[in-house]
Amino acid sequence: MARFLHLADIHLGFDRYNSPERTKDFFFALSDVIQKYAIATKVDFVIIAGDLFEHRVIQPAILNQAQLCFQQLQAAHIPVLAIEGNHDNTPYGTSTSWLKYLSQWGMLKLLEPGNIAAGEPLYAPWDEVNKKGGYIDLACGVRVVGSAWYGAAAVRAIGQIAEAVKALPTGPDTTVLLFHHGLEGQIARYSGALRYSELMPLKEAGVDYLALGHIHKNYCEGGWIFNPGSLEANNVEEGGFTRGAYLVEVDAEGIHADLKQDYCQRPVVRLLAKTQDSDSEADVVAKARQAVEVAIATGQLVPEQQSIVELRIEGQVGFARLELDTKQLQKDLQALSQALIFLLKYEVEEKEFAEPIASEASRDLIERSAFKDMLTAHRDYKKRADTLSEGLIDLKHKRLSGQDDEALYHYLEELLV
């Protein structure tokens, strides 16, 4: 029996929120998964199906994080087999990458197809001396085959890979192929995903376990296609995805993949506050605070965990939406929730009011109607819209007649009493 751990989309060095603590979360997740589901379970090997790193160019501290994790596996004599993803593939015009660096130093084995244009076979066996190869036959009875990041050329590459896998020498009974691409229908707003039928040549070529990466959501199809999802959430939406690492066992009865999710992850909490057209700025602030306070009271949000929190405020308001100081509100709510990152999504609409106006209406009537519509839409002025709109017309005439500013201010004070 063989046992292995399938990881993908680790994204060490994630820095989207400009938070050093959030960047460390991705390291802590990987380290914990390795301890719990690779070392403690004594797997035969670990596979990484792309995007170990968030960026092609990484900082020394991020490289050190990867080395610390892989040194744990080295000490346990567990090999790591990896491929490049779209985030960490070899930059155009160069011949090296940080994954190749780790491979050359024996931290992992980067399984890459050969350069056919240079006369190399698509798949050569792993050469431990030169730290190079496209596939490896392991003593546990599994053949692991690598691939590259193909992007839009994935369908064409699948045909080439399938033919090359068929032509490989006879080897272990089980073949695992690492492939960084997504399957159609698994996630919205993702173009270029592969159809199931387009992957079938790999199954027909003898691939028993297609280890996917790229989409950050867990899925499996047909009993042979497996995608664990990312270890950590890359955005608040992914906080609600089923994600993790596959602990896989291969025995005489077949393949058994168990998704593991119990490891170090920072909680992501999404909240909603609904407004109505009669709400003032103070009302909106109170509703926002209430949404956070209720989440704390019900245990949805635990301040001590320093979660990532998103509060979406939506609906209509009875004031100009830009009058609300959202920066101060975000700061206050972050302090209240003790969130590491607090994202305030202020997506309200101002109440609109418009009286029908005849096409032949005079300019004076149009102006009066515009003032009245604006005042009617404001919660503080709508009951006096008729009086105030007349006052604004008078104010315009007074300005045009040349009255000074002091007189105009005095007129406004009396109008608003």
Task: For every predicted segment, state its role.
Residues M1-C69, A75:
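N-terminal active-site segment of His-dependent metallophosphoesterases
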Residues M1-R22, G134, R243, E249-K274:
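Domain-start "cap" segments at the beginnings of catalytic or binding domains
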Residues R3, K42, R143, G206, ...:
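Short loop/turn motifs at secondary-structure junctions
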Residues Q35-I39, Q71, K166, M200, ...:
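Surface-exposed alpha-helical segments enriched in charged/polar residues
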Residues Y37-K42, L168-G171, L301-E304:
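Glycine-rich phosphate-binding loop signature in dinucleotide/nucleotide-binding domains
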Residues F45, R56-Q71, A76-E249:
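His/Asp/Glu-rich metal-coordinating catalytic cores
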Residues I255-V417:
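Accessory, non-catalytic peripheral segments of nucleic-acid enzymes
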